[in-house]
Amino acid sequence: MFRLHSLSALAELAVGSRCYHGGSQPTQMKRRLMMVAFLGASAVTASTGLLWKRALAESPPSVNNPKSELGDKGKNKDEGEVCNHEKKAADVCLEPHPEEKKKKRSGFRDRKVMEYENRIRAYSTPDKIFRYFATLKVINEPGESEVFMTPQDFVRSITPNEKQPEHLGLDQYTIKRFDGKKIAQEREKFADEGSIFYTLGECGLISFSDYIFLTTVLSTPQRNFEIAFKMFDLNGDGEVDMEEFEQASCPGNIIRSQTSMGMRHRDRPTTGNTLKSGLCSALTTYFFGADLKGKLTIKNFLEFQRKLQHDVLKLEFERHDPVDGKITERQFGGMLLAYSGVQSKKLTAMQKQLKKHFKEGKGLTFQEVENFFTFLKNINDVDTALSFYHMAGASLDKVTMQQVARTVAKVELSDHVCDVVFALFDCDGNGELSNKEFVSIMKQRLMRGLEKPKDMGFTRLMQAMWKCAQETAWDFALPKQ
């Protein structure tokens, strides 16, 4: 079709040109020939455009050519439905493994967006992190609005390489009007009844004050809370009331000011992200009872911390779309290395080791994953125990790791979990663990990167240089004896 139109148009142009330059035709004929030539060129352009549009419609989708239609405009509705059914059937037959689905999403644009979001997690203030990763703005009946995170948003805000959903970003939210009955019906959507997020109120949603409190709980070691409770337990009975607890763990307190989040936070009334004077009403009721006259023991608070860590780990596990309650070995390795800070080339090599060892892996259940992370909670004691083995000349093999887990953390590590860990950290392939690298990476994984300072180090570098210059000048000023 394109070839016929082109040949006819060129023939018309050739005839018109000869007649025009020959001078044998009158002026009216020349104009008529020019009009025919113009119409022929227009027909060629139109036919070329139609053919190009059809070629785009029939080509597979790509980054620059997203497929938005299933056929030409001339196709009727029934043909479109048949195509849809055939496409769905083909997708069912050729449905890839869940891990393969996740590989296809990381294009060039996605990688750059994830790098930008990782910088936000690493260097931005808590206010900006919250405003970027929160996805809901609830408007109440008087017209006042407040921004909230869902539990999934909270996990995404502390997990590297987890991309924010499209069209949601800094100060971009999904708007929800306050309707008590409707919100109550959607409660299960945000948090399960057994989840610690359910106790926060607001249907399991997380306000800015809750966000700071939860990150403080996650980033503070258990030993620090034990010391803080003893400091503010004035009568020494092992219990604190609400006033004493607010001094120890709420806005403006000692513990929060020692965390990287707390040191970076500044109240910003313009954005509405200011820390309130106390815990939310749901948490105070959870800790101190309905009348707020109860006592909180360190045992109960550490149980709250344990439940929070369990719920966050559960959300991380479910994010990998487990099949029959299991995730793949590579996904488990990704969970272990998420906060490692390992260079990309080495990270790729470690992932290839897993792929080589577990081509047809049997997967890991949540119970196996939770047991290993319970083992990691005692990583300092594990480090000491492994050092003793190393100094005694014993090899750090899988049996040794299982023995340390039983002795230190009181958990059983399955043989399959140990196989995955050794495939990651057995650098020379001799069946022995690289102790230092394993412990350093696992310490970062336990704290989820929340203990790192939220700056690029320039201020600390200048302070160190200034201190060095002062000491050097003082040494020059003093006479040598």
UniProtKB/Swiss-Prot annotation:
SUPFAM superfamilies for the chain: EF-hand (SSF47473)
Region listing for K/R-ring, in residue ranges: 128-131, 264-268
Extent of the signal sequence: none
Phosphoserine: residues carrying this PTM: S124
Residue ranges of the region described as C-helix region: 460-470
GO molecular function ontology, one term from the record: calcium ion sensor activity
Modification after translation: Phosphorylation at Ser-124 by AKT1 impairs its maturation and stability. Asymmetric dimethylation at Arg-460 by PRMT1 decreases the calcium sensitivity of MICU1 by promoting interaction with UCP2.
Modified residues (Asymmetric dimethylarginine): R460
Compartments, record wording: Mitochondrion intermembrane space; Mitochondrion inner membrane
Source species, domain of life: Eukaryota
GO biological process: calcium import into the mitochondrion; calcium ion import; mitochondrial calcium ion homeostasis; mitochondrial calcium ion transmembrane transport; positive regulation of cristae formation; positive regulation of mitochondrial calcium ion concentration; regulation of cellular hyperosmotic salinity response
Entry keyword set: Calcium, Calcium transport, Disulfide bond, Ion transport, Membrane, Metal-binding, Methylation, Mitochondrion, Mitochondrion inner membrane, Phosphoprotein, Repeat, Transit peptide, Transport
Cross-referenced PROSITE patterns: EF_HAND_1, EF_HAND_2
InterPro entries per UniProt: EF-hand-dom_pair, EF_Hand_1_Ca_BS, EF_hand_dom, MICU1/2/3
Positions contributing to Ca(2+) 1 binding: D233, N235, D237, E239, E244
Chief site of localization: mitochondrion
Basic and acidic residues biased stretches: 69-82
Amino acids binding Ca(2+) 2: D426, D428, N430, E432, E437
Stretches assigned to the EF-hand domain: 220-255, 413-448
Similarity remark: Belongs to the MICU1 family. MICU1 subfamily.
Subunit relationships: Heterodimer; disulfide-linked; heterodimerizes with MICU2 or MICU3. Homodimer; disulfide-linked. Component of the uniplex complex, composed of MCU, EMRE/SMDT1, MICU1 and MICU2 (or MICU3) in a 4:4:1:1 stoichiometry. The composition of calcium sensors within the uniplex complex can differ depending on tissues: a MICU1 homodimer can be present instead of the MICU1-MICU2 heterodimer in skeletal-muscle and kidney. MICU1 is recruited to the uniplex complex by EMRE/SMDT1, and it associates with MCU at low calcium levels, occluding the pore of the MCU channel. Associates with the MICOS complex.
Role description: Calcium sensor of the mitochondrial calcium uniporter (MCU) channel, which senses calcium level via its EF-hand domains. MICU1 and MICU2 (or MICU3) form a disulfide-linked heterodimer that stimulates and inhibits MCU activity, depending on the concentration of calcium. At low calcium levels, MICU1 occludes the pore of the MCU channel, preventing mitochondrial calcium uptake.
Domain notes per entry: The EF-hand domains have high affinity for calcium and act as sensors of calcium levels.
UniProt protein name: Calcium uptake protein 1, mitochondrial
Gene that this polypeptide is encoded by: MICU1
